[in-house]
Amino acid sequence: MQPLQLSHKGFKAYDIRGVVGAEVNEDLAYRVGRAYAALYHPQAMCVGYDIRPSSPAIAKAVMRGLTDGGADVMDIGLCGTEMMYFATFHYGLSGGIMITASHNPSNYNGLKLVREGGIPVSADTGLKDIEALAFSGDFPEAERKGKTFARQILQDYIDCILSFVDGTKMKPLHIVADAGNGCANIAFAELKKHLPFTFTELYMEPDGSFPHGVPNPMLEECQKPLKEKVLEEKADLGIAWDGDFDRCFFIDENGKFVEGCYMVGLLASYFLKRHPGEIIIHDPRVFWNTEKICRLYGGVPVESKGGHAFMKETMRRVHGIYGAENSAHHFFRDFSYCDSGMIPWLIVTELMSETGRHLGEMVAEMEKEFPVSGEINLPAKNVEKTLAAVKAAYAPKALAIDPTDGVGLEFENWRFNLRPSNTEPLIRFNMETMGDRSLLEEKKDEIMKLVEESNR
């Protein structure tokens, strides 16, 4: 084939994602399929896709590339990313490809690639090789042409997800669920049949034009309808998912967004109470609460660089039972170390049923003991210069310096992490203190001002 004339901007650290036409198209998808087949020689793959208008055609193109490269392909159709992970490890396939751009606007699309067992193909583990071969078009001739076959995986997937909780403990709850017009209702509609809950549903209809805004519950404007509905309905809990439902977000009974670090601590306590001594993986952003939970219940906290590929690699290496990023990615050993947006809320409802306490009550002490800033995105023209300026100002007085991801500095009763975004000219800022909200505000403003000044 001729070399591909297309921007390379779609190739990110963990996946391929970009504007349809300019950065991602059917030609690229076909070539990625061919390159994957040429480099890894898979026997059988699965391919799934999300609800974006461009997804079915891109999925067909990548399947054609895989079969032309000699691989058989299981077409699992419209699904969430974790369903692609599930199909890969549950059916013993050589790998999988998901067509999705997660929470990005509808004019974006992308490809998420995994090997056997759901192991990610990222820039450090083969994605750059796939990029080079896809753009060169220098594919070897396959010895045979692969075949495509369709398979319905939903029921097997649902059975797996339900196995993470004890259904006999579930008690009636009123829950508001918001799918943001993404894929979540594919799984949610089937899961709810097995649960004794009353649901009020928001934006469940899959619609890749995202008429109610991008499906990104990290954004306050996306949380607003869910918060209002929880209060209006006097519901027990609010849950929301991003576009491909590999992330799950929580609104408590008071209509308040629960920061990811407290959800990590809560789920860590769930696993450690049942499996004392196990290993819990956390990212470098804010983790004092998670460390305390581990000490309390006899667990072992292990830090990993942020990003799903790094988290999964660390979990596999140390055999962690559970891991999470504060960005709402939750990873489970018994889900082949992959992330799921459905397992977390089932665990939370089991905890609520078991204890008779609402989510807000369960995290209140954590919020008081370890207040956090939440993740703040700060523009940075020169990321390295900005990080160096902050480090020069604060490192001399730090009790500990953590180079795991960006700049992490720890002091007597506060700490912060600044790390570059993998995809945008931004620095992501997170901070926590030991019970001191006024110190949190003081130091947060101080550091944000320094970042702003270093960009002038």
Region spans (language model):
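A short, gly/pro- and small-residue-rich
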Residues: 107-131, 251-266, 335-346, 352
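Gly/Ser/Thr-enriched, mixed-charge loops and adjacent short helices
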Residues: 109-233
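An N-terminal, well-structured beta->alpha segment
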Residues: 1-64, 68-70, 148-173
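Phosphate-binding and adjacent anionic-ligand microenvironments
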Residues: 275-456
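Proline/glycine-rich low-complexity loops and linkers
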Residues: 127-159, 163, 253-326, 330-332
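Glycine-rich phosphate-binding loop
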Residues: 94-102, 108, 230-252, 257, ...
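N-terminal small/polar loop signature for handling phosphorylated ligands or for N-terminal nucleophile
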Residues: 45-109, 162, 191-251
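Short glycine-rich phosphate-binding loop at a beta-alpha junction
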Residues: 44-50, 74, 174-176, 278-284, ...
